[in-house]
Amino acid sequence: VMIESLSRRRMLSLCASAGLAAAAGASSQARAQASAAQWPAGSKPVRIVVAYPAGGVSDVVARALADKLSTQLGTPVVVENKAGAGGAIAMDMVAKAPADGYTLGFSSISPLVLSPHLGKLPFDPVRDIAPVASVMVSPVLLLATPACDAKDFAALIAQAKARPGEVRWATSGLASLGHIMLEQIQQGTQARITHVPYKGGGQQLNDALSGQFEILSTNAGPAVMQHIQAGKLRALAVGAPGRLEALAAVPTLAELGLPAANLSSQFGLFAPARTPAAVLERLNAETRKALDQQDLRARLAATDNVPTGGTAADFARQIAQESQGNARVIRAANIQMN
């Protein structure tokens, strides 16, 4: 009888504990839902951590988007610049911020799709970060310098195959997007091209204009477009979702039969992973609404960027696909950071 009594008391205790746990869970969920329904609360500011220095193209775009979101949400949206480590510093701040919708990140997807395959990060790109919305694509141009006499992409590949290693391709650095593009092209065409990694883009562009190498890959932008229009650089191909209006005769790498090499810099908004779904959905909707406005689209076009948008699920899927592709290329080419 005593054993039965103890067992019964134990069972009642367990049931009571389970009930309390369930009630606590339901209460926590209810609080989260209530908090999401009240977001944003009054004049509490939303912070966007921008992974680039103040004054650059990405910062200008982020601030223009912040102004739109502030108007639409009826609350201040402030920008905080945290450049460094290829965007990883800013994304780490976002990953470790409270998941309440008041801290967002603006960055290219590189810290999520390149950096994880090159070294250890202080955050987990999948578990700690929630993609909110794709904002824009910055096309990557494949340019011939004065040292290159190839008139089109096919001629360039023919030269590279005829003289393995003699064609030199400059990028902004080891394991940069341009470097991944180069490796994808080599794997897709069996051409052998010499990689010339720079540290950033300033000196790279100056050396391109003086013909220090044959090929340059760089993001589209007013300065680069000016040199193309002046005939100092020739566009052979572009990495972008479609042809650029300003370079309508230049094919994308996908059109040239190299879809894996058709890479561009994609930028977007991100949040801490456990941000309430209702807040993420609202942020996605408001970002898409902002990107539909003609003045913001004109601002992006003026910097040679292409507005994107789409659902958060689409954005997350694109990130996962590019990360998987980069992992394969980095392994195959044995790319390692010093």
Features from the language model and the residues they span:
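N-terminal secretory signal peptides and thylakoid transit peptides that target proteins
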Residues: 2-19
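N-terminal signal peptide c-region/cleavage motif recognized by signal peptidases
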Residues: 23-27
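N-terminal (or domain-start) structured segment
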Residues: 31-128, 166, 174, 190-219, ...
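Short beta-strand/turn micro-motifs at beta-sheet edges
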Residues: 35-38, 128-132, 254-260
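An extracytoplasmic/periplasmic, membrane-proximal ligand-sensing/linker region
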Residues: 41-45, 229, 255, 277-338
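Hinge/capping helix and adjacent helix->loop/strand transition within the periplasmic-binding protein
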Residues: 96-102, 109, 116-203, 253, ...
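C-terminal lobe and pocket-closing loops
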Residues: 137, 223-292, 324
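Ligand-binding pocket segment of bilobal, Venus flytrap-like solute-binding proteins
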Residues: 166-174, 178-250
